Amino acid sequence: MIPVKICGIRRLDDALLSLDEGAWALGFIFHRPSPRFIDPVEAAALLSKIRERSGAEFRAVGVFVDWALDELNAVVREVGLDAAQLHGAEDPGYAASVEAAEVWKAFRVGPDFEASRPDDYPSKMRVLLDGWSPTEAGGTGEVFDWSIARACQETRPVFLAGGIDAGNIAAAIAEVRPFGIDVSSGVESSPGIKDGELIRKLFSEARACSSD
C-alpha cells in the first residue's frame, strides 16, 4: 500500500485506528490557528500512549509554521518526533538547520507556484505539496492542479496533500504516482474531528489501489 500520513492527530483512538489500518505516519500540528492544533506537552503525552498501545512502526511528524528555529528543535526533542514538517516560508538554510531525523518541506501550490521550487531545498528532504489558501497555512481541503505534482515528481518523490479523501485517492494515485498521500480534512466529520468510518474508507481505497 502507498504510504499514507494521517495529519491533525489529537485523540488516541484516532491514532490507533489509523495505525491499525496501515498508516505510515501520523501528523501533529503545532500551528495554533489550526482547528487541529495540539500543544506540544499534550502531544508528547499522546505520542507516548500511542507507542505504548500500538506495536506498529510509524513516523511521528510535527507540523510547524514559521517557528523560531531553536524553539522548533526543542519541541522535536521534547515530544520525541521522528520528523519535522515545515509548512511556512522557511528557507533552505533554515530547513538544513532543523535537528530532526527527517525534515519535510511543504509547499502550498498557488497561482504562482513553480514546479522547480522544491529543487532549491536539499535532496534528502521530503517534499509535500498542498492546496493553497490566502488565509490558511494548510488543512484547507482544496485540491490543486495535479499536473504540477506530476512535474515535481519527475525530479524527487512527492507527498500529495490537498483535499484527498476516499472519493479521489484512487484518481490521485493513478494520475500523480506520488511517493505518498497526506490526509487531514478528508477523514474528518468537522474541522479537527476525525471520523473512524472515513478513516476506514480511505484505507480501504488505498489498499484497493495497491492490489490493482
Regions found by a protein language model. Give the residues of each.
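Conserved N-terminal beta1-alpha1 strand-loop-helix module at the mouth
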Residues: 1-212
